[in-house]
């Protein structure tokens, strides 16, 4: 049923501009029009990462459910976890439209949304009534006009502490001017110190410690990766998400849309993001949790991220082309791949192709 929905839905949605289509997909999930997917609870896929119990390693990346409108509906598609946001303290409209572009030949997407969202309070109101064991992460960012961006991240930690299962500090979007400057070593040190101090303060009050991840860009030099790894380890951060969208346009077939400004995601970013993932795994060692994201379109590509060093994986853009049945197919496909590999846990395959990916150039 989901397969036929995918084919009909894609044809219909692709007649619309991408942002309108996205809004309609959110509305469909809200109204229950999208069929749910019952994935088997394969114990081999279960992971304990950063103290959280994931039924399977596949998550919905931030960017789809910016305003926490459909986290529970997304979990019913087969995802083991989902991440809302990016949310900023104040509502902001983002950049002018058009700001999302499909690269159909490449199965990629370029966006220059600019953290458009309804702000902390709107997302918090939607998250507070949610009950259940589903893992919902909160991706936090800074307002475009903020005079103190680090304070915006601290505000996100404090505001969502009662509802987040984990936090992601997003400092890697290319669509907010100057945001990626927070990846520079001195700025990153100040950010991590402030964010983790706020987390520890809230943890002392709440009696629970919520893990904090850092989402980084794929457009990093070797020196830049060295600096990030050093600061992450020095501050005892809980984990990394590798990676956000890229500014690179290497190898694209659609040279017309490729000229649009913004971050590229989907299948074209798989290789670059996986190389950076492996290089970061090599730098931070075996213990630090890493979530791999970028170009995951199948069980095979999800497993390749894990082989390159990821504990968990996320997807988003490839669902634009594959439809809402994709997470269920990926999870079922991972079980079949584990049958073939004859392993008791998917964790046994982590890092099995680390050197292959880490030795490649970005």
From Swiss-Prot:
* Subcellular location per the Swiss-Prot or TrEMBL entry: Cell membrane
**Cofactor note (record):** Binds 1 FMN per subunit.
Write down the EC number. Answer: 1.3.5.2
Q: Which CDD domains match?
A: DHOD_2_like
Q: Which reaction does it catalyse?
A: (S)-dihydroorotate + a quinone = orotate + a quinol
The Gene Ontology biological process annotation of the record reads: 'de novo' pyrimidine nucleobase biosynthetic process; 'de novo' UMP biosynthetic process
> Which residues bind substrate per the record?
66, 111-115, 170, 175, 244-245
| One GO CC term on file | cytoplasm
Where FMN is bound, by residue?
A: 62-66, 86, 139, 170, 215, 243, 266, 295, 316-317
Organism domain of life:
Bacteria
State the top-level EC class. oxidoreductase
Q: Which InterPro entries match?
A: Aldolase_TIM (IPR013785), DHO_dehydrogenase (IPR050074), Dihydroorotate_DH_2 (IPR005719), Dihydroorotate_DH_cat (IPR005720), Dihydroorotate_DH_CS (IPR001295)
Q: Which GO terms describe its molecular function?
A: dihydroorotate dehydrogenase (quinone) activity
Q: Where is the signal peptide?
A: none
Q: Which cofactor does it need?
A: FMN
Q: Which Pfam families match?
A: DHO_dh (PF01180)
Q: Which keywords are on file for this protein?
A: Cell membrane, Flavoprotein, FMN, Membrane, Oxidoreductase, Pyrimidine biosynthesis
Instruction: Name the catalytic site residues.
Output: 173 (nucleophile)
Pathway the protein takes part in: Pyrimidine metabolism; UMP biosynthesis via de novo pathway; orotate from (S)-dihydroorotate (quinone route): step 1/1
User: What Gene3D superfamilies has UniProt attached to this entry?
Assistant: Aldolase class I
Q: What's the protein's topology in the membrane?
A: Peripheral membrane protein
Per UniProt, subunit arrangement is: Monomer.
Q: Which family does it belong to?
A: Belongs to the dihydroorotate dehydrogenase family. Type 2 subfamily.
Q: What does this protein do?
A: Catalyzes the conversion of dihydroorotate to orotate with quinone as electron acceptor.
Query: Which PANTHER family does the record match to this protein?
Result: DIHYDROOROTATE DEHYDROGENASE (QUINONE), MITOCHONDRIAL (PTHR48109:SF4), DIHYDROOROTATE DEHYDROGENASE (QUINONE), MITOCHONDRIAL-RELATED (PTHR48109)
Q: What is this protein called?
A: Dihydroorotate dehydrogenase (quinone)
Q: Which species is the source of this protein? A: Rhizobium rhizogenes (strain K84 / ATCC BAA-868)
């Amino acid at each position: 049923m989901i397969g036929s929905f995918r084919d009909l839905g894609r044809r219909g949605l692709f007649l619309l501009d991408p942002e309108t289509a996205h809004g309609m997909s959110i509305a469909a999930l809200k109204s229950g029009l999208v069929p749910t997917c019952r994935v088997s609870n394969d114990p081999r896929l279960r992971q304990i990462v950063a103290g959280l119990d994931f039924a399977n390693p596949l998550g919905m990346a931030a960017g789809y459910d910016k305003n926490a409108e459909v986290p529970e509906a997304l979990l019913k598609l087969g995802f083991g976890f989902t991440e809302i946001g990016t949310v900023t303290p104040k509502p902001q409209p983002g950049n002018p439209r058009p700001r999302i572009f499909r690269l159909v030949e490449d199965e990629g997407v370029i966006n220059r949304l600019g953290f458009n969202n309804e702000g902390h309070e709107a997302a918090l109101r939607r998250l507070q009534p949610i009950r259940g064991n589903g893992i919902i992460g909160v991706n936090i960012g800074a307002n475009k006009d903020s005079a103190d961006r680090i304070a915006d991240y601290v505000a996100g930690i404090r505001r969502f502490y009662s509802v987040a299962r984990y936090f992601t500090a997003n400092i890697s979007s290319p669509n907010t001017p100057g945001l990626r400057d927070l990846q520079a070593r001195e700025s990153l040190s100040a950010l991590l110190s402030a964010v983790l101090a706020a987390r520890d303060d809230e943890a002392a009050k709440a009696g629970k410690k919520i893990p904090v991840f850092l989402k980084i860009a794929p457009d990093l030099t070797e020196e830049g990766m060295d600096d990030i790894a050093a600061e992450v380890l020095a501050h005892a951060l809980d984990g990394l998400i590798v990676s956000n969208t890229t500014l690179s346009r290497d190898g694209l077939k659609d040279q017309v849309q490729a000229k649009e400004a913004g971050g590229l995601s989907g299948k074209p970013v798989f290789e670059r993001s996986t190389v950076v993932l492996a290089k970061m795994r090599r730098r931070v060692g075996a213990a630090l949790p890493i979530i791999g994201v970028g170009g995951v379109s199948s069980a095979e590509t999800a497993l390749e991220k894990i082989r390159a060093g990821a504990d968990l994986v996320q997807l988003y853009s490839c669902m634009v082309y594959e439809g809402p049945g994709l997470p269920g197919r990926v999870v079922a496909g991972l079980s079949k791949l584990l049958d073939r590999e004859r392993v008791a846990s998917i964790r046994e395959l982590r890092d099995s192709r680390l050197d292959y990916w880490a030795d490649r150039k970005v």
